[in-house]
Amino acid sequence: MASSTSTRTPAGKRVVNQEELRRLMREKQRLSTNRKRIESPFAKYNRLGQLSCALCNTPVKSELLWQTHVLGKQHRERVAELKGAKGATQGPSTGTVPQATKRRATDVESQDAKKAKASAGPQVQPSTSASSANLDAARAAPSKPGLGLLPDYDDEEEEEEEGGGEERRDSSKHLPDAQGKEHSLASPRETTSNVLPNDPFNTNPPKAPLVPHSGSIEKAEIHEKVVERRENTAEALPEGFFDDPEVDAKVRKVDAPKDQMDKEWDEFQKAMRQVNTISEAIVAEEDEEGRLDRQIGEIDEQIECYRRVEKLRNRQDEIKNKLKEVLTIKELQKKEEENVDSDDEGELQDLLSQDWRVKGALL
């Protein structure tokens, strides 16, 4: 019987047509495209749809083996190396930010000190106009330079912002009080300058009015303290920083050398016990195998001995049978000989009983 898609040969083998082969190939391609693709940053497919690991540069035969490859030793080592390289690159970048803020803070302080010295030079004779100008400058100062370090603080980490938030609030609360005190100190100076004449023989010039610093400098000092605290933590200290190993371990918040040695000794003893148990189990297994081999050898020897005994018994039976046959034959021969002897004696007696003359005549 023949069909449209396939035929059968006289031998019974099935011959597939070209159309059916094409249909099967299309189904296979559709199944291969519909299979689940691996969604991973390290998974990579080539033009033929073959899966490979971009991190290890190794091909994976199928999607079912991807999880096995991810849990493998080589892939985990590559991932750990990648994480370590990322941590090493992020470390120096975060460490450079506090140094830049320190430099900016010191530059701001030096500039303020220069301004204070410059303002202290011409104010040898205090006046109402100078004091009022200083007060106006002091009131306007917090609003202008306070913007100098704000972008730097936007780039800091969230933890530093939370830690310095309370101190910033306290400093902002104290600023109005300081301005009020300075205003109250400046008002008596104005009254005294109006009442008393200028003394040309006064060798001690009046001190320059206190100009309140802006909040940016206080913020820089707070940030500098936070950076110094972070640099002075136990994580920044290298191993062996202190001569005393116990103090060094206590500061770095690790186990003391003695405790570490005890811990290592306990681990060593535990490992030795495990090795001893394994070796004892191996020796016991070998002894058991040797005992079984000896028993098998003894059993084989016993079987061989039983075979030899059976052979000897069979040979003994054969010899006994042969001996019996020989004895019976001998007895028969004796009986025949006795019969022959008796016949000879009877004939001899017959001859002797006859007359000799008759005997001679017969001859």
UniProtKB/Swiss-Prot annotation:
Effects seen without this gene: Mice die by the end of preimplantation development and exhibit a dramatic reduction in the total cell number, a high mitotic index, and the presence of abnormal mitotic figures. Mice appear unwell with significant loss of body weight and rapidly decline afterwards and die. Mice reveal major alterations of their digestive tract including a distended and filled stomach and an intestine lacking spontaneous peristaltism. The small intestine exhibits a thinner wall, less abundant and stunted villi and highly disorganized crypts.
Modifications made to the protein after synthesis: Phosphorylated in response to DNA damage by the cell cycle checkpoint kinases ATR/ATM.
InterPro entries to which the protein is assigned, alphabetical: Matrin/U1-like-C_Znf_C2H2, ZNF830-like, Znf_C2H2_sf, Znf_C2H2_type
Chief place of localization: nucleus
Disordered, as annotated region: 81-213
Function as written in the Swiss-Prot or TrEMBL entry: May play a role in pre-mRNA splicing as component of the spliceosome. Acts as an important regulator of the cell cycle that participates in the maintenance of genome integrity. During cell cycle progression in embryonic fibroblast, prevents replication fork collapse, double-strand break formation and cell cycle checkpoint activation. Controls mitotic cell cycle progression and cell survival in rapidly proliferating intestinal epithelium and embryonic stem cells. During the embryo preimplantation, controls different aspects of M phase.
Protein name from the UniProt record: Zinc finger protein 830
Organism this protein belongs to: Mus musculus (Mouse)
